[in-house]
C-alpha cells in the first residue's frame, strides 16, 4: 500500500482543532486506509482517548492496523460511521488485545453481517465495552443469535441495532441471554419486530427499550 507521509502534520492540526491531546476527528480530512495505517504507528497519539473517522471508505485494512497498534492502548472511544469495515474488519477488532480501554465502539453503516457478530460473540477482548453501535448494518436474526451468546460483554450498557433486518426470532434469542447484566438501552428502531418480540425483550428489564 502507498505510504502516507503527512500523518504527523494531520495529528498536530487535529489536536489543535480539538483543543486537547486526547481527541481526533478526521471526518473532514482526506483520509484512507494508508493514512490509518500510518496513524496506528504514530508515537504522538499515545494519549489519544477519542477517535472519529467517518465516511472515508475505510476497510478491514484500517481495522487490522488499529487492532495491532502499540500506541492506541489508551483509546476509549472509536467511531467509524459510514465506512467499509465489514465482517473481516470486525474480526480484527474482536481478536485484538491492544485496545484494552475501549469503552465505545460505533460502527454504523459498515456492511457488517452475521459473521462479524459471531467474531464479537467469540471475543474475550471486549470486557470494558459499555457502548456498541451497529445500526444500519445487516446482522439479521442469525447475527443476533450469535450476539446473545457473547461471553465478554458483561459491562455493555447501550446497544444500538437500528435497521438491521431483525425480527421477533432474533429478539427472543436475545431475551433468553443472561450475558448482559448491565444492559440499560437497546434501540431497535426500523426492524420488523412485533409485540411478541418486544414483550420477550421486556423480560430482560431493560430500562430504555426503543421501539420506533
Task: Locate the predicted segments by residue.
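Leucine-rich solenoid repeat scaffolds
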Residues: 175-212
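Leucine-rich repeat
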Residues: 6-15, 32-41, 59-68, 86-95, ...
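Consensus "Asn ladder" position of solenoid repeat domains
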Residues: 29, 56, 83, 110, ...
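Eukaryotic tandem repeat interaction scaffolds
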Residues: 88-89, 97, 102-158
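Inter-repeat linker/turn residues at the boundaries of leucine-rich repeats
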Residues: 19, 43-46, 70-73, 97-100, ...
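Eukaryotic endosomal/vacuolar membrane-trafficking regulators centered on PX-domain-mediated PI3P pathways
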Residues: 2-5, 17-19, 124, 188, ...
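Conserved hydrophobic beta-strand positions in leucine-rich repeat
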Residues: 22-26, 48-53, 75-80, 102-107, ...
Amino acid at each position: 500500500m502507498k505510504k502516507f507521509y503527512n500523518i504527523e502534520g494531520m495529528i498536530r492540526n487535529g489536536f489543535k482543532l480539538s483543543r486537547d491531546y486526547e481527541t481526533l476527528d478526521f471526518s473532514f480530512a482526506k483520509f484512507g486506509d494508508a493514512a490509518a495505517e500510518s496513524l496506528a504507528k504514530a508515537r504522538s497519539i499515545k494519549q489519544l482517548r477519542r477517535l472519529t473517522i467517518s465516511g472515508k471508505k475505510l476497510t478491514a485494512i484500517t481495522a487490522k492496523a488499529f487492532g495491532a497498534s502499540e500506541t492506541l492502548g489508551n483509546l476509549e472511544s472509536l467511531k467509524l460511521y459510514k465506512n467499509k469495515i465489514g465482517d473481516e474488519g470486525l474480526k480484527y477488532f474482536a481478536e485484538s488485545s491492544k485496545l484494552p480501554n475501549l469503552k465505545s465502539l460505533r460502527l454504523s453503516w459498515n456492511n457488517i453481517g452475521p459473521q462479524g457478530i459471531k467474531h464479537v460473540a467469540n471475543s474475550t477482548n471486549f470486557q470494558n465495552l459499555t457502548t456498541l453501535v451497529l445500526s444500519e448494518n445487516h446482522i439479521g436474526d442469525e447475527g443476533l443469535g450469535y450476539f446473545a451468546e457473547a461471553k465478554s460483554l458483561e459491562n455493555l450498557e447501550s446497544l444500538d441495532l437500528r435497521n438491521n433486518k431483525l425480527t421477533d426470532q432474533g429478539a427472543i434469542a436475545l431475551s433468553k441471554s443472561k450475558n448482559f447484566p448491565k444492559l440499560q438501552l437497546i434501540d431497535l428502531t426500523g426492524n420488523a419486530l412485533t409485540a411478541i418480540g418486544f414483550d420477550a425483550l421486556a423480560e430482560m428489564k431493560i430500562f430504555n427499550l426503543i421501539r420506533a
